[in-house]
Amino acid sequence: CGASFNIYKFLEIVSPALFKEYSLEKFMEKNIKIEHVVIKEEVKKPDISSAPPCEQIQQLSENHKAICFLESRKIPKDMWNRFGYTSLFGSYARDVNKDYSLIEDERLLIPIYDEHNIFIGVQGRSLANIKPKYITLKKNEKIKLTYGLNTLNLSKRIFVVEGPIDSLFLPNAIACLGSGNFLEVREKFQNQDLVYVLDNEPRNKNICDIMNKLIQTNEKVCIFPNHIKEKDINDMVLKNLDVVSIIEQNTFSGAAAMLAYNSWRKCK
């Protein structure tokens, strides 16, 4: 389209009435503070005894492939205890569910726990040039997996992303493990304040369709500004961008979200 505006300027030009309404809404969000007493609860540690045994990250040498991967993706060290490692993923998969039959490749393990800290599945990330890059396993095929349930604070805003690694860079976030699952999240969190952060792929029809449906149901969505070219949160972190601020400043709903969405699709 050739022109680039932030959402405020865009609304002011296209719809002055909506611009006033949106500006007032943002003003109210920033200036009304409700003070309340917060009782801090100790975060329960995952019940690792409920998960199949694997090598813990802290047991690996500093030049190990798994360590090098975590460092290369700038994953904070205080998050490393959320990962594991296996050189025999096929055997590990059978320990998760005897019906799995997979090759014995080496993978970084991302265990998935429910809200009671019980192991319900795992995502394996290839550390070699093997496809698929990610394989998700379920202990029980009937269970819908969501990453991050065991660390969630339901009284705070919840950020919803696609992949577990992206979720580690946001406060109080979950990963729905596949773009097709975004539309099912509200079913589980009917009364919570959700913000959906889809990958920044305006030419991906599937992503666009999902975002459009979320907007139509009046959900809050992050629509990245035109100057952000990185595809996902981790890529933005690698470019030293302040992803939390970017997301907070570019979260919209209703008519403002639809205007931003249409601009996002045209200008990328």
Regions found by a protein language model. Name each.
Residues 1-16:
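Short metal-binding segments enriched for Cys and/or His
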Residues 4, 132, 155-158, 164-268:
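TOPRIM fold recognition
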Residues 14-108, 116, 217, 249-268:
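TOPRIM metal-binding catalytic domain and adjacent DNA-binding surface shared by DnaG-type primases
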Residues 4-8, 21, 63, 67, ...:
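Alpha-helix initiation and N-capping motif
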Residues 2-3, 58-64, 224-225:
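Short acidic alpha-helix initiation/capping motifs at coil-to-helix transition points
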Residues 1, 113-115, 199-201:
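Beta-hairpin (beta-strand-turn-beta-strand) motif
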Residues 90-193, 207:
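Phosphate-handling DNA/RNA-contact segment within nucleic-acid enzymes
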Residues 8, 67, 71-72, 77, ...:
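Short glycine-/small-residue-rich flexible loop motifs, especially phosphate/cofactor-binding loops
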